[in-house]
Amino acid sequence: MDILIKIIYYYNYLVLFYFLIIVTIYLLLNAISFRNISRYTKKVKFVELKEIFRIHNFKPITVIVPAHNEENNIVQSVHSLLQLEYPDYQLIVVNDGSTDDTMKLLFDHFHIRQSSFSPYYEIKSKPIKAVYLSSAYPNLVVISKENGGKADSINAAINISKNPLITVIDADSILERDCLLKIARPFMENENIVAVGGTVRIANGCKVNQGYVEDVGLSKSWLARFQVVEYLRAFLFGRNGFDFFNGILIISGAFSCFRRDALVSVGGYLTGSIGEDMEIVVRLHKELRRKNKKTKVTFIPDPVCWTEAPETFKTLSSQRKRWQKGTIESIRLHKSLFFNLRYKWMGMLVFPYYVFFEVFGPFIEISGYVVFFISLFLGIVPLNFAVVFFSAAFLYGTVLSTLAVCLEELSFKKYVRPKELILLIITAILENFGYRQFTAWWRFRGLLEYVIGKRSWGKMERKGFENNGKPGYSPAMR
């Protein structure tokens, strides 16, 4: 019994030590993020985007939209994507074995006809049945292929495209009109950049018209509001901070841009993966650096994409478990990066961070709650210590989230009404009472399910921005 009490006693200090380390890391990332965003906003204000593309040689882009059973939003989505601001871009819609009217709607609304184009398979994908061109929109291409999933659809489109830049989005992503101008800029400024990600925002509560966010607002759902703050914190602080170390391991599957030659050189997306958006980024870092090529994956803090967040516990739970499984899978597949000096900051700092705090973090957090309350019940930990610890954790979480809201307001000002800013700050406080614990529990369940071999992808049920969505490919903060 004495041994068990000692284990419980010292485990509490282990959790406290873990908490202090992660607080230190987050404070460092926050300081770096404030500096980076301040510099970025000054640079963006100094020169107009369109002026840059008039002066410099721009790189043509291919926008890839995997679509499986997207009959409820495919027409509006394609119409809006055809109106993006960019000098030269191609739009490829991949019909991934849809069993609904997705293909029929594309025929009816975009005047597509089958071409004689024969694809050259530089990377492996399911067979392409046909390639269609539009008589009304010269830059629109539609691919019909056997069902193989999102990653396989992207690979098929890469085989068709010959443009140097590849942008991948979800069929239900809502893009800013100038998103391609913003996402392509880093490729023009640095030839070593192989991938760029941008900030994804929550569209729940926003007014959407003709495929674009017309008025930014907040959802009436507290679950959606919690995710707004969560996304602000993850993108403006987390990814922006890691960008300083060239340590971005995840680019959101809802909107990302890559150099085509880099994707082809590593064999394209991994089909059958739970988290293909993270795996491809980690593999780019690993394989290109192994070949001694100077590479950089970077992040722009601009809000370039809007996505629908789950508003039910069931759907949100499924999403977070899937994200956790995807993270574990990517870490397991590329474990050779762990404390590997060859990969510098990536191997010695960023990858270990993901192992200790993203993979095993949920276990430590959930077990920490359990052991802590057992300690209180048995009198191992004094009540005043517990009060101080939980107060510090609450204060830290609130400050971190509130800083993210303030940084958004100072830099991008998407939420212009005072009522919404007040609501966001209230949300930043309330998320510490339940929401954060639920997300830790869902991630912990994702870890357990992965360990026991339950690695299914699952569905992401959506209401849709016009209240008529159906399940399809899931958008993600990832």
Write out the residue ranges for each language-model feature.
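Long helical/loop segments within the catalytic core of UDP-sugar-dependent glycosyltransferases
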Residues: F117-S153, N159, N163, R177-G272, ...
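Short aromatic/hydrophobic "clamp" motif used to bind/position activated sugar donors
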Residues: I166
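A short, conserved alpha-helix in the catalytic core of glycosyltransferases
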Residues: A262-S265, S273-T298
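Active-site donor/metal-binding and catalytic loop motifs
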Residues: T295-T315
